[in-house]
Amino acid sequence: MTIALGKFTKDESDLFDIMDDWLRRDRFVFVGWSGLLLFPCAYFALGGWFTGTTFVTSWYTHGLASSYLEGCNFLTAAVSTPANSLAHSLLLLWGPEAQGDFTRWCQLGGLWTFVALHGAFGLIGFMLRQFELARSVQLRPYNAIAFSAPIAVFVSVFLIYPLGQSGWFFAPSFGVAAIFRFILFFQGFHNWTLNPFHMMGVAGVLGAALLCAIHGATVENTLFEDGDGANTFRAFNPTQAEETYSMVTANRFWSQIFGVAFSNKRWLHFFMLFVPVTGLWMSALGVVGLALNLRAYDFVSQEIRAAEDPEFETFYTKNILLNEGIRAWMAAQDQPHENLIFPEEVLPRGNAL
């Protein structure tokens, strides 16, 4: 039996190989296969947002001015969500709502679904870009894993939450003041600050900020100096063989401060990765729960006692009254189509009034 050994040669004109060679070529800005998703989606999402905040009104969906053309500034302009009556329609330009009319499409809130969907796929493309480039240079994929956390938050807040409610109307509009209003809405209708998933998210974000500050300061404090000159730190040389800072000195310092300290760099940096990523993932899970109208902590016994005893009130019961006030004022403003009217006697009043 004869066995022929040799290199298997593919057709040189193979389209996949040609594209792969061009897309993954070493250039100033890496493109890659992920770039086919990232660059068009990011371009359309940003372009839609700039177009909406510059020219498009929210009069037909929210009864608001929301563009620079109407007198808004950077903090008050927004690309607003579609009207509640449009439910979960994708609002395609060629769909039954706009019927190819670009002006009508903008008036109906079509730019919001356009920006939200292209933005979500653009973020996913950016995560895939990190994964693809890491494989190309033989790195671990932890950058991509870390970036999955803000993607989870974006998808849960802008897509999953309104999908669980009656329509895109209840998602945040794309603007600074608009998102502040959405946060107030979350507090009033879901008591979000008392939700344990929100607490984990806050602990993750603030804990990560603390870890970054401590880590940066510690590294600066323990840099190996390489002479007396102002610019003679060999740490600026990317090919240095020696360490940049003294882990041993840092370990001794924090051992004296706290009594405990990280003993190796792997555990230290994994912890710095773990804290914010886990916090953001937990908050994303919490928002998915809110999409299903799951409730946070309820201390009903305190509410009952506060209702019966005029002299008893806690910070919790005061916050519950605040939430009722937010709901009473916000519902009538945000949902004028519901014709909600709250007489004076049903508006919340604290025991102090």
UniProtKB/Swiss-Prot annotation:
Gene3D superfamilies the UniProt entry points to: Photosystem II protein D1-like
Signal sequence interval, chain numbering: none
Positions of transmembrane segments: 41-61, 125-141, 153-166, 208-228, 279-295
Annotated positions binding chlorophyll a PD2: 198
Domain of life (superkingdom): Eukaryota
Residues annotated with Phosphothreonine modification: 2
Protein's name according to its UniProt entry: Photosystem II D2 protein
Originating organism: Vitis vinifera
Residues at which pheophytin a binds: 130, 143
Subunit record text: PSII is composed of 1 copy each of membrane proteins PsbA, PsbB, PsbC, PsbD, PsbE, PsbF, PsbH, PsbI, PsbJ, PsbK, PsbL, PsbM, PsbT, PsbX, PsbY, PsbZ, Psb30/Ycf12, at least 3 peripheral proteins of the oxygen-evolving complex and a large number of cofactors. It forms dimeric complexes.
Binding locations of chlorophyll a ChlzD2: 118
